[in-house]
UniProtKB/Swiss-Prot annotation:
InterPro entries, per the entry: Ribosomal_uL13, Ribosomal_uL13_bac-type, Ribosomal_uL13_sf
Protein name (database record): Large ribosomal subunit protein uL13
Similarity comment: family membership: Belongs to the universal ribosomal protein uL13 family.
Cellular component annotations (GO), alphabetically ordered: cytosolic large ribosomal subunit
Subunit and interaction comment: Part of the 50S ribosomal subunit.
Role, per record: This protein is one of the early assembly proteins of the 50S ribosomal subunit, although it is not seen to bind rRNA by itself. It is important during the early stages of 50S assembly.
GO terms, molecular function: mRNA binding; structural constituent of ribosome
Biological classification of the source: Bacteria, Pseudomonadati, Thermodesulfobacteriota, Desulfuromonadia, Geobacterales
Natural source organism: Geobacter metallireducens (strain ATCC 53774 / DSM 7210 / GS-15)
Biological process terms in GO annotation: negative regulation of translation; translation
Entry keyword set: Ribonucleoprotein, Ribosomal protein
Amino acid sequence: MKTTKVAKKEEVTRDWFLVDADNKVLGRMATEIANILRGKKKPIYTPSVDTGDFVVVVNAEKIQLTGNKLADKMYYSHSGFPGGIKSIAAGKLIEKKPEDLIRKAVKGMLPKNKLARHMLKKLKVYAGPAHPHEAQQPKTLEI
């Protein structure tokens, strides 16, 4: 009888990857990042265990959106009070906090469970080309 090997949290080895977001399309880049954070590219992948790697994204301010999404795509938040809804266009969000645009796109592509919070903590996004993770020697990932 053959059995499937289930990954254990202690056995998982985590690598660091560096992604340059310069002139990359947001959605296509976010799907690749989400798959790496989940560990779907690894042979030891188990849905109930966080087997993913760390991802460092640089140049978030140079991300591209296709079509007219810079003006049309809206992000909403609500305070919980009546009339407390706020909206911001994707173009304004890139100007204010470009890191949030990538983080929100990747978060929407992760599973909606407790593991998603742990997976999202492994995503490090920086607006410019500099990042403080040189000591981890991240491998450059072409998307």
